[in-house]
Amino acid sequence: MKIGLASLAVVLVLHFPQKSDQPVPVEEEPLHKVEFKNDAVTVMRLILPPGQYTQYHIHTHDRVAVQLSTTSTTQQDWKKPEGPANPVKPGDFAAMTLEGNSYTHRVHNVGKEPYEVIDIEFAQRPTAPSAELAAPVAAENPSSRIYHWVLAAGATAPMHKHVRPYVIVSVTTLNLQMNSPDGQTAARFVEAGSFRYVEVPPGGSFTHNLANIGGTPGQIIEVEMK
């Protein structure tokens, strides 16, 4: 049986995934933008327009996701059907544990608004995790713990101590003030979705609290390495 060139081209397209469909490391996925990276963590921001998919991408570390938008998404693991829609809103978070050597998937924004998320990936799991907690743990994986602060206007979180480096994420726009036990204060206006990596040297610590000195409610998430 003879097969024409046009028919052969169709067969090749159907049976061999195109280059754009092949998984890439998450840092190379076009919509995942690396905004901070050091030897300990990589912080990426994904903004996915409504109706669009990311490229299939590969995660090779434990990670934390902090949601910054109100929409719905689906997850599709490599070579598996697309999963159900999952609504998200600002302040939702998840601490994900890598099972095996890697995890490959893509994300589909099935909502009507852009999907924005901060993805924090940890270079390696600690050989000796810290047993000291800064606050009640909202979620954790083998590499990190999440502390979630919901601050009404004028509210102050309890004083707490970090003994490991951490990433502080502002879920909402607010006027934030940090106070230390010796009376020092530092205030700044932070925008929704902004973050900062805070270094805590081995054997050291950093004690502070968080105060919302503005007139609207705020949310802060601290992601502390173990």
Identify the meaning behind each predicted range:
Residues 36-40, 78-99, 183-202:
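Short acidic-glycine-tyrosine-enriched beta hairpin
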Residues 29-55, 60-65, 131-168, 223:
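A short glycine-rich, His/Asp/Glu-containing loop-to-beta-strand
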Residues 60-79, 163-182:
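Glycine- and acidic-residue-biased ligand/ion/polar-headgroup-sensing regions
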Residues 20, 101, 112-116, 120-127, ...:
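Glyoxalase I/VOC metalloenzyme domain signal
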Residues 106-111, 160, 208-214:
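Asparagine-centered strand-capping/turn motif at beta-strand->loop junctions
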